[in-house]
Structure formats: C-alpha cells, structure tokens
C-alpha cells in the first residue's frame, strides 16, 4: 500500500505546502480535507471512499467544499465523512451554511460517539475490513486522532494536540508501522505549542519513541517557521526513522 501526503502544512497554505490531506488509494482512506484536497483528482473513482476528520478547523476541512470541482469530469463513488459529533455539526451547519457555501455535496456523515474500536467494511474487492480506534486529543475546540489497522499494516494519525495528551493515546498507537504526527513548531517553542494545542518536532519524536513506532512522518508543518538543518539533524538523531513530509510525498506502508 502507498500513503500519499497530498498536503503537509498547517494553518494556511504557503508557496511550499498546502494544508493537510493524505490518502491511501488502495483502501479508499482519506485523512483530513485541507487545501490539498483538490489533489485527490488523481485518485477518486467509482469505488467507496472514507474521510476521517480530526477536527473542524478550516485548515482540515475547507477542502470538503471542492467536491463539485473534483466530480465535474469523473464519476465518484459514495464518500463517507467520519468525525466527532461537534466536528460534523460544524461542517454541516457552518462550513456549508447558506452564506458560506450553500450547495452541500452528497456526503454521508457518520458521527464517532465513543473511543471504542470499530470496523468498516471498505466494499472494495480484495480488501478486508478496516479496524479504527479513535483517540481524544488536546486542541482548542477538541480533536480526534486515529489508529487504523488493515491488511496487516497499522497507521496512526495524530494532529493537532499537545504532548500532555499523549498519555491518553500512547497505548492505542503502540508499535504502529507508521505514525503520522504533527509538529507545528521547532524546538524551543514548547510554551507556544502548549498554549496553542500543538507539539514541537522534539516532542513528536518523544511520542514516536514512547509508542515504539517503526516510522515517524512529520506533518502540519508551520508555514512561517520551518525547521532548520540543525533541527532536522537533531530529530533524526533522536528518532532515526523520521521523514519531515513535503507535499506529494509517497510512502510505502
């Protein structure tokens, strides 16, 4: 399976990065719907798709409004959007409100109401059901992270959150093959990260170490304060199997 990081940035797009959206095309799994959502035009087809939203901040959901452009020249299968009740309410009632974007796409919204694991039938030939475990994160307005197990592979997706919240999800993400984790700030910005509901790149490495993750992919990169070479080398020394994601990165899982 291949993981495509379509957008690797946070907060707002820049000349280098669009905001978060990733896809595993083989299983129809989409992670968040930031400004990079338009890049799904290379993948969407008539099979079913599942979008998992972490929260309703615009850098994670604005791409949901791009549906009509993505479907103008192709037939697209049913799209199910998963998220907390609060996130889905914000998407339906605010993002798609009459003054902002009055034409709701034919998404099927399914609220996640507990942190218990559940399985999804992907309705794709040759695909086993996918196990999903939602985990609570610490971010203004609330957020969810996820662990996905499918086809003998495990992926954790954790953004946006603080280091203190890691105790709530470390057990769930133990020994994952790939940990996709935000790092909105370089080292030295720990106080700012805590205040805004984020982590630094050093803290993300600590989480990966504690979880026993095999690989760490850093996303939600700050569009204003990027990581310098010393910080990149420092994180690699702490956790060698790390990639600081760039847009359109492809990772074999």
Task: Give each language-model segment a name.
Residues 163-249:
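Cap/insert and terminal regions of metallo-dependent hydrolase folds
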